Amino acid sequence: MNKKFFFFDIDGTLAVGTPGRQYIPESTKKAIHLLKEQGHFVAIATGRSYAMAVDHMRSLGFENMVSDGGNGITIDNELITIKPLDYQKCLNLIDECKEKGFIWAISPDNKTRRLAPDSRFYDFTHDVYMDTEVVEGLDPRNYDQIFKVYVACFAPEEQKLETLKELPWCRFHKEYLFVEPGDKSVGIKMMVDHFKGDYKD
């Protein structure tokens, strides 16, 4: 039997239900266990940050994960790396948000909460995906790196943000969008390379 590499997304693949109230069916856990028993390589591949995905990884019995939209790698339960977004492009976007009155927040670290300069982000979104912590006078330049930026607006308002075109982004909720890496294949290839696998598998 040829060893195969299986990568599973969390949202909408392993986890069912609405964000913030998701669960993983027992049948899914059993199927993953059977793949491992048969000698196949299994890993999570998610757009979620490491901090927002690691509990799912552990509860499902995974040891390996591609996180942060392809920019994070965990091997044998050890976080190897998370590459942040382009710092200057994030600052440019936040500056434009301030200038044009867009509500914004950031994830400057690997934690299960985002930072916002005031309560407007939560007031606008009522988001349950992750906690929003208010840091009065939040200045993104006080942080060395930025992993995600969040912009609260309804589509197609984001088209007014010229600097958004320079960054990868997606919309999972009608109230706000995520500026985050979106090419999980980058992390998947890094993982297959690490284990000296073949991409065809």
Protein language model annotation of sequence segments:
Residues 1, 11-14, 48-56, 174:
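N-terminal-biased segments
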Residues 2-21, 44:
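Asp-based phosphoryl-transfer active-site loop
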Residues 5-7, 64, 197, 201:
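Hydrophobic "anchor" residues on beta-strands that sit immediately upstream
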Residues 7-12, 72-74, 140-142, 167-171:
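Short, basic/glycine-rich phosphate-binding loops at helix/coil junctions
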Residues 19-22, 42-44, 82-83, 127-128, ...:
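Short, flexible loop segments at the rims of nucleotide/cofactor-binding pockets, characterized by
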Residues 22-27, 149:
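Substrate-gripping "pore-loop 1 plus following alpha2 helix"
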Residues 27-120:
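Active-site phosphate-binding/coordination module
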Residues 102, 107-201:
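Conserved acidic, metal-coordinating active-site core of Asp-based
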